[in-house]
UniProtKB/Swiss-Prot annotation:
Keywords: Cytoplasm, Isomerase, Manganese, Metal-binding. The gene is deoB. It holds the Pfam family Metalloenzyme. The lineage of its organism: Bacteria, Bacillati, Bacillota, Clostridia, Eubacteriales. This is Phosphopentomutase. CDD domains: PPM (cd16009). Its EC number is 5.4.2.7. It catalyses: 2-deoxy-alpha-D-ribose 1-phosphate = 2-deoxy-D-ribose 5-phosphate; alpha-D-ribose 1-phosphate = D-ribose 5-phosphate. Pathway: Carbohydrate degradation; 2-deoxy-D-ribose 1-phosphate degradation; D-glyceraldehyde 3-phosphate and acetaldehyde from 2-deoxy-alpha-D-ribose 1-phosphate: step 1/2. Its cofactor is Mn(2+). One of its GO terms (cellular component) is cytosol. Binds 2 manganese ions. It comes from Clostridium perfringens (strain 13 / Type A). One of its GO terms (biological process) is 2-deoxyribose 1-phosphate catabolic process. SUPFAM superfamilies: Alkaline phosphatase-like, DeoB insert domain-like.
Amino acid sequence: MSKYKRIFTIVIDSLGIGAMNDSEKYGDVNVDTLGHIAESVDTFNIPNLQKMGIANLHPIKHVAPVENPIGYQAKMAEASVGKDTMTGHWEMMGLHITKPFKTFTDTGFPQELLDELTERTGHKIVGNKSASGTEILDELGEHQIATGDMIVYTSADSVLQICGQEETFGLEELYRCCEIARELTLKDEWKVGRIIARPYLGTKKGEFKRTSNRHDYALKPYGRTVLNELKDNNFDVISVGKIKDIFDGEGITEGNKSKSSVHGMEQTLEIMDRDFTGFCFVNLVDFDALWGHRRNPQGYAEELEKFDVNLGKVLEKLHEDDLLIITADHGNDPTYTGTDHTREYVPFLAYSPSMKGHGQLETPKTFATIGATIADNFGLKMPEGTIGESVLNKLV
């Protein structure tokens, strides 16, 4: 008999809580996503995260620690090499990434790859550099609309991103080109973690807006994860946001795309009204995409306050035999130089209405603590070659 019938894990994408011990190896010095956001604003009101003990883990301006937080808290460390979305999420479900995914941040993509992409898609390519999505649209959006060329760019992550204006380039055409790019980049020397379709609207510089029709074409996980174990043993695995894309559909029984992080929380609240047995895995991407990468601490703080209101509704809806875990996949300090992710600890906040105790757990050495705890709860073995130790027996 499972201790919890339903487990909900909500990933606040990029909500790091302070530099990891090895962060300087990643070029990240004194980074602190949550701490620096709080220092950048005049007021910061997150009463539900506060009640769950987030300020007990980490000093946060305007948010005091609480004497008796609900549930259990820990600062989780990342065992894998990297600080990107796929590494973080794959590790949560048990995989240990020891070789970083290929990046083309400094060089752009090889000409041979671009030539093949042009030949297969029929579109010339412009861009081919590391850039922020909004800047590259201002630079090349008008050119694309006039010529039909493809805007290809990358970032510090292992990604090849293709932009297409929805009305002139066409959404289906953009997806077709991305599928070809995914096929081409399965070669070892070009193997990026994700191809991302970046559709946008608008006709001139300063007015371009990316739409919610983004699609990620990820590599399949290189091994079995906790999600596969759950699905193969007839448990529900319901995803919200970009989770299905991150795992290329592996181990997911139902995928729900979100238009925004607020929408993702609304979807989660609807799923909570359903009767199911298994796991609901939620990713809220706006924190990272709209505020972290764009180095906007004010926007990030406001998004967290909106999230906290919906978190209150989630807490109210939890059944006695539900478990809620709030976490993140990496940091993205909006006050730090550049536009890239930051290597940080992430929160592990676990709560069920059936808990009698509360308190801080020792720092787990891996994000896979989450996957191991889920597997343990449902009486499943961790897949061969995975990492992670369950803390289920500590959640009392």
